[in-house]
Amino acid sequence: MAQEEEDVRDYNLTEEQKATKDKYPPVNRKYEYLDHTADVQLHAWGDTLEEAFEQCAMAMFGYMTDTGTVEPLRTVEVETQGDDLQSLLFHFLDEWLYKFSADEYFIPREVKVLNIDQKNFKLRSIGWGEEFSLSKHPQGTEVKAITYSAMQVYNEEKPEVFFVIIDI
């Protein structure tokens, strides 16, 4: 498992972006990006299933911008369900991507899972953040879609581990 560390990608932050980032404590990062032909594979993990879901969402958003420059000015909730853990993960990420790209242009600084019903595969989550603005948030790479391709969910032992390929 990769070490927990800060995102070391160079976003060429402005002084204003650096000041925003320095205002808040860093969010725990338990994910990494793995190369995949023409796409990117998110590798996220957590001590609990909830944390693995949270880290996977933040890995997706972290690919689009430096989430450290996001201020927690408002909240957005996402409720989703699936037929199994893989489809629940797919729909969870897809709903959060919708909040960013098609609905509210919402970018979270942090996502927390409030409840997972593992029997019925339902999930409630909340994100703290703000509307994405190119003048405030450095532009990373746009995520076009979540895919089922090579999706893996390991939740039989700790840590919980997810692998998800995102279409960029």
From Swiss-Prot:
<keyword id="KW-0479">Metal-binding</keyword>
<dbReference type="InterPro" id="IPR002804">
    <property type="entry name" value="Archease"/>
</dbReference>
<feature type="binding site">
    <location>
        <position position="167"/>
    </location>
    <ligand>
        <name>Ca(2+)</name>
    </ligand>
</feature>
<dbReference type="InterPro" id="IPR023572">
    <property type="entry name" value="Archease_dom"/>
</dbReference>
<dbReference type="GO" id="GO:0006388">
    <property type="term" value="P:tRNA splicing, via endonucleolytic cleavage and ligation"/>
</dbReference>
<feature type="binding site">
    <location>
        <position position="168"/>
    </location>
    <ligand>
        <name>Ca(2+)</name>
    </ligand>
</feature>
<keyword id="KW-0007">Acetylation</keyword>
<feature type="binding site">
    <location>
        <position position="39"/>
    </location>
    <ligand>
        <name>Ca(2+)</name>
    </ligand>
</feature>
<dbReference type="GO" id="GO:0046872">
    <property type="term" value="F:metal ion binding"/>
</dbReference>
<protein>
    <recommendedName>
        <fullName>Protein archease</fullName>
    </recommendedName>
</protein>
<keyword id="KW-0819">tRNA processing</keyword>
<feature type="modified residue" description="N-acetylalanine">
    <location>
        <position position="2"/>
    </location>
</feature>
<comment type="similarity">
    <text>Belongs to the archease family.</text>
</comment>
<comment type="function">
    <text>Component of the tRNA-splicing ligase complex required to facilitate the enzymatic turnover of catalytic subunit RTCB. Together with DDX1, acts by facilitating the guanylylation of RTCB, a key intermediate step in tRNA ligation.</text>
</comment>
<dbReference type="InterPro" id="IPR036820">
    <property type="entry name" value="Archease_dom_sf"/>
</dbReference>
<comment type="subunit">
    <text>Component of the tRNA-splicing ligase complex.</text>
</comment>
<dbReference type="GO" id="GO:0072669">
    <property type="term" value="C:tRNA-splicing ligase complex"/>
</dbReference>
<dbReference type="Pfam" id="PF01951">
    <property type="entry name" value="Archease"/>
</dbReference>
<keyword id="KW-0106">Calcium</keyword>
